[in-house]
């Protein structure tokens, strides 16, 4: 059987990565920046230099190069999407997540008619990219349930993504056959010892099975594969480095797949987990710019976990995809008028940017960029953000 990313990760032991980050010199950073500016391919050591403490004084130079690289690869366009939470039942005990099975929150699961109602509300905003999410409760929201939801939504959305629990390759293939074309999986942290502490019980505790999920999704025919770590669980520079390695592995191993990276930071949630390794906004900027220089063709997604000012400023510095009109509550689009207390009681985490689609479009245009509401065919409509009747 061919290699998986779980075969690659041990080649970069945690202590060696930590030592490598600490030993980066100013010269190492400048060499990496010169390579990027000249359009040369960066290797893993160059990427390590760019996420190291030694690169922090060079953010302005990184920003200039990252802006140029992004425009060359993607033009002046930003893709828009929104999440649709199908259910928040979960059997895991992730200590940092609002869906933790021990948390006393209101649990719910959409019927197929409710799924379609949510889809209609979202489609009316003009968005044609949607991301389906659930907790990890396969007995309730199994692959067949998610596939049926995708089939119900397919008439409204040319591009449907999933961010759900780890599945088998056959299950991912079932989703592809139902119309799902993109896949997102956060490893949360690449520090296996810490990962096991953060996931004391539940199927998600299987570090290796989750780690290899992007490989299985790519083999199953997903058009786009998105990986990421949740910054704040471990030292951010280590997880940033491993995320870049993971994305590069998928890109090199499955050349027909579009690779993307998300860069979420910890946000307040239901529960008591507070053992956070903070990543500042400046840290996030460094990470995103380093990703752009290391992986010029990769999409980079920024979520509503970040405040509006920062999201707007990052539009020109490497970001290619951004969420809008977000609700992290089950049924949160069709029932947006319900009171804030009920929304808070079912949400996975608190969002920092609550702008709707029209406001996000205006913000993107104010930065001199074109909002893109449809990413796939037909090509002649791909750059329109028109609303449906």
Model segments located where?
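Auxiliary Fe-S-binding modules of radical SAM enzymes
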Residues: 1-55, 252-389
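Generic structural signal for well-ordered alpha-helices
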Residues: 82, 119, 146-150, 172, ...
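Canonical Radical SAM [4Fe-4S] cluster-binding loop centered on the CxxxCxxC motif
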Residues: 75-114
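Catalytic cores of alpha/beta
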Residues: 168-177, 234-248, 307-317
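Core AdoMet radical
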Residues: 101-217, 223-227, 231-233, 255-262
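Glycine-rich, proline-tolerant flexible connector loops at the mouths of alpha/beta enzymes
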Residues: 47, 51, 82-84, 131-143, ...
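Conserved, mostly hydrophobic/aromatic
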Residues: 39, 66, 94, 132, ...
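Short, charged low-complexity linear segments at domain edges
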Residues: 58-79
